[in-house]
């Protein structure tokens, strides 16, 4: 399922570009303007609902922090549970974690060990606002699988395709994005 030209235009026009943030030479894609535009947010969420309503999902997993917004909203629309994937040290119960590399070092994400224990072999959709290099998303897919579930697809509002992160992620799961930034 793809966006219509009208839907794509509504979503793209609602995302603000911030030049030189967080450092010179970077153009930051600010989704807060999409979130505070009821029409654009509605078009986004309705499209995701229509795409995923027949996937027989058990959970939506959202990546800290903007993935929580889209993921929790979609989970409610689909009538499934929501599972947060957080930066290390933010979850209160027993967790498993996965490291991933950054430009200068490493970071780590974690999930509750029992996040999917209520449904054996749970079918999970991973959601985040954007995929760039793919490190966080790849670590998140690995966590979902380590926790005993199956990540059936990873979904992003934006894909920065020039960074090739989606290619790395395609080795682990199917990948879908609403808007591609070349």
UniProtKB/Swiss-Prot annotation:
Major location category of this protein: cytoplasm
Family matches, as InterPro entries: Ade_phspho_trans (IPR005764), PRibTrfase_dom (IPR000836), PRTase-like (IPR029057), UPRTase/APRTase (IPR050054)
Compartments where found: Cytoplasm
Pathway of action: Purine metabolism; AMP biosynthesis via salvage pathway; AMP from adenine: step 1/1
Signal peptide boundaries: none
Recorded superkingdom: Bacteria
Catalytic activity: AMP + diphosphate = 5-phospho-alpha-D-ribose 1-diphosphate + adenine
SUPFAM superfamilies according to UniProt: PRTase-like
GO molecular function terms attached to this record: adenine binding; adenine phosphoribosyltransferase activity; AMP binding
Keyword Glycosyltransferase (UniProt): yes
Top-tier EC class: transferase
A single Gene Ontology CC term: cytoplasm
Keywords: Cytoplasm, Glycosyltransferase, Purine salvage, Transferase
GO biological process per UniProt: adenine salvage; AMP salvage; purine ribonucleoside salvage
EC nos: 2.4.2.7
Subunit and partners: Homodimer.
NCBIfam families: apt, PRK02304.1-3, PRK02304.1-5
Similarity field: Belongs to the purine/pyrimidine phosphoribosyltransferase family.
Function: Catalyzes a salvage reaction resulting in the formation of AMP, that is energically less costly than de novo synthesis.
Name the record gives this protein: Adenine phosphoribosyltransferase
């Amino acid at each position: 399922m793809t966006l219509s030209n009208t839907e794509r235009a509504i979503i793209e026009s609602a995302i603000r570009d911030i030049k030189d943030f967080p450092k010179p030479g970077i153009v930051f894609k600010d989704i807060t303007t999409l979130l505070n535009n009821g029409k654009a947010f509605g078009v986004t969420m309705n499209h995701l609902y229509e795409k995923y309503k027949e996937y027989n999902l058990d959970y939506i997993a959202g990546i800290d922090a903007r993935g929580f917004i889209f993921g929790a909203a979609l989970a409610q629309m689909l009538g499934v549970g929501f599972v947060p994937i957080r930066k290390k040290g933010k979850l209160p119960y027993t967790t498993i974690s996965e490291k991933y590399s950054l430009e200068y070092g490493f970071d780590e994400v974690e999930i509750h060990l029992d996040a999917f224990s209520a449904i054996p072999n749970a079918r999970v959709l991973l959601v985040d606002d954007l995929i760039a290099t793919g490190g966080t998303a790849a670590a998140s897919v690995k966590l979902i699988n380590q926790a005993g579930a199956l990540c059936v697809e990873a979904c992003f509002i934006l894909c920065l395709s020039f960074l090739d992160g989606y290619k790395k992620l395609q080795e682990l799961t199917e990948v879908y994005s609403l808007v591609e930034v070349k």
